[in-house]
C-alpha cells in the first residue's frame, strides 16, 4: 500500500517535473513566437483637419485589407496589426504619432500623411532601419531611392502624372497647345519645370503657366490671361477643388474651348461632381479603378461586398498601400529574411507583373520608388460618374 502510494507520488512528481520542464522549454519559445507574430502597420492618418476627406478613406482602406488578410489566416501564420493615430494633417503631430506608435510597437511598415512628414521623418527612418514607409504623398522629390531608400509612392509621382496626361494629349492631338495652372505651394510647383521639358519632347507647346496664391478666390485676371493663350488643354495641379470650377466656368463664359484636366487629389468622383454641369468632360489621371468601374476586378468586387456604398479613390489608395506593404512582408518571410527596411524595400522592388486584383488595371512592376502607371478618366455629369477616356498608360 505504502509502496503503491510512494510510486504514485513519484510518478506525479516526475510528470509534474516533466510538465514543468516542457513548460520551461516551450514558454520562452511561445514568447518568442508571440514577439515575432504580428506584422505591424503604423499610420499617421489625418482623420480630422483639412485632409480628413482623404484620411477617413485611407484609414478604412488599410483596415479592410488588413481584415481580408487576417480572415484568410494572416501572412505565414502571423496576424497583421494596424495601429493608426489621428494627425489633423499637421507635421509636428504626425512626427509625435510616429514616435508614440514606434515606441509602443515593433513597427514594420508605416503610412505617412503628407510630403512634409515624409521629408521630416526620413532621417529617423534611415536611423531606425526596420521600417518601410509609403503614404498620401506623390511628391516627385520622394521618387529618389538614393535619398529616400526606405520610402515609396503608391502610384506615379506628380511629374509622372503630368507625363501620363501629356502622353494622352500628344496621342489625341499632336502638337497641341497646353496651359499649366498651379498653386503657389510646394505641392503646386512640384511637377511644373520637368513637365514643361517633357511636353516639348512630346512635340507639345506649353503656351502659358499661371501660378495662383493658395486658396485664391478671385481668378478673373488669371482667366483673361488663360483665354488669351487659347490652350487646347489646361492642366490644373496643386489644388483639391477651388479655384478649378471658377476657372472652368469663367473660361467657358469667355468662349474658351480648352479641355480641362487635373491630377490625383482633384480626381475623386465626389470632388469632380461638385464642379456641376460645367465640369462635364473634366479629365484627369487616376492610377486606380473607381469604386463603380464595371471592368473585371475581383478585388473591387470584394470591396463592394464589404462596403456597398461608394468608396473614394483615397480608400483605394490606402487599400493598395496595405496590399504592397504586406506583399513586401510576405516576400521577406518567404525568403527567410528579417523584416528590415532594406529587405522590405528590396522585396517591394522584386514586384514584377503583380496583379492587384484589378485595382490598378494592368500588372505592375516596381523598379524604384514609384508606380508610373495611370489612366485618363473623364467626368460624365449625366451619369454622375468618372468614365475611362484612355487605356492604361505606362511610362
Language-model regions: role of each:
Residues 42-62, 85-91, 114, 181-189, ...:
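Extracytoplasmic "Venus flytrap"
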Residues 40, 53-60, 72-142, 154, ...:
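Beta-alpha junction/loop-to-helix N-cap segments that form part of ligand/metal-binding clefts
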Residues 94, 153-176, 217-220, 243-244, ...:
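Hydrophobic alpha-helical segments within soluble ligand-binding/sensing domains
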Residues 106-209, 259-283:
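Extracytoplasmic ligand/sensor domains, especially the bilobed periplasmic-binding protein
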Residues 248-319, 389-393:
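Extracellular/periplasmic periplasmic-binding protein-like sensory domains
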Residues 305-315, 326-386:
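Segments of small-molecule ligand-sensing domains
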